Amino acid sequence: MRIEKCYFCSSPIYPGHGIQFVRNDSTVFKFCRSRCNKLFKKKKNPRKLRFTKAARRARGKELINDATQLLEQRRDEPVKYERAMFQKTIEAAKTISALKTKRYGNLIRKRLQPGKIVQKKGLLAKVDKKMHLIRAPVANRDGVKTRAAAKEKKTAESMETN
């Protein structure tokens, strides 16, 4: 069973599904759904449409130049059937898929990290501004007074420098 890739969006096309478009110069284009076929005929750029793999790669949301993707490349050479070899490839495919999901998770974590840092800084700034709502004015008056004095001193220094 050969699983093809859609020419437009790169999603898998299983046997008995999809549309084939053959141009006059005998190049074959395979599409997974009518949406991809229509957009191809309208000469739309797949990198500019958000649902395609090309667009996801361009925006950094998919793995690029990963060794696990080399194994998905199409090979047109027929291979003689050997049971042991096919069992090894099935085992390798399982380990590769596990590795691929792990790497994809790491990619997502790396992409989210800067946003989390910014969010944390914003929350800390909000806490500093609204400290009077968090801490009761009667409790720990010395700490509040010293902080207030320090803030006044900072504002006075900044005014002097300007």
From Swiss-Prot:
GO MF annotation terms: structural constituent of ribosome
Q: Which GO terms describe its cellular component?
A: nucleolus
Question: What highest taxon heads this organism's lineage?
Answer: Eukaryota
Main location per UniProt? nucleus
Which InterPro entries does the record associate with it? L24e/L24_sf, Ribosomal_eL24, Ribosomal_eL24-rel_N, Ribosomal_eL24_CS, TRASH_dom
Q: Per UniProt, what is one Pfam family of this protein? A: Ribosomal_L24e
Q: Which UniProt keywords apply?
A: Nucleus, Ribosome biogenesis
Q: Does the keyword Membrane apply?
A: no
Please give the coiled-coil regions recorded for this protein: none
Q: One of this protein's GO BP terms?
A: ribosomal large subunit biogenesis
Asked if the Swiss-Prot or TrEMBL record annotates the protein with the keyword Lipid biosynthesis, the reply is no
Q: Where in the cell is it found?
A: Nucleus, Nucleolus
To which protein family does this belong?
Belongs to the eukaryotic ribosomal protein eL24 family.
What is the protein's quaternary organization?
Associated with nucleolar and cytoplasmic pre-60S particles. At the end of biogenesis it dissociates from cytoplasmic pre-60S particles and is likely to be exchanged for its ribosomal homologue, RPL24.
What function is annotated for this protein?
Involved in the biogenesis of the 60S ribosomal subunit. Ensures the docking of NOG1 to pre-60S particles.
Name of the featured protein: Probable ribosome biogenesis protein RLP24
Q: Which organism is it from?
A: Caenorhabditis elegans
Which gene is the coding source of this polypeptide chain? rsl-24D1
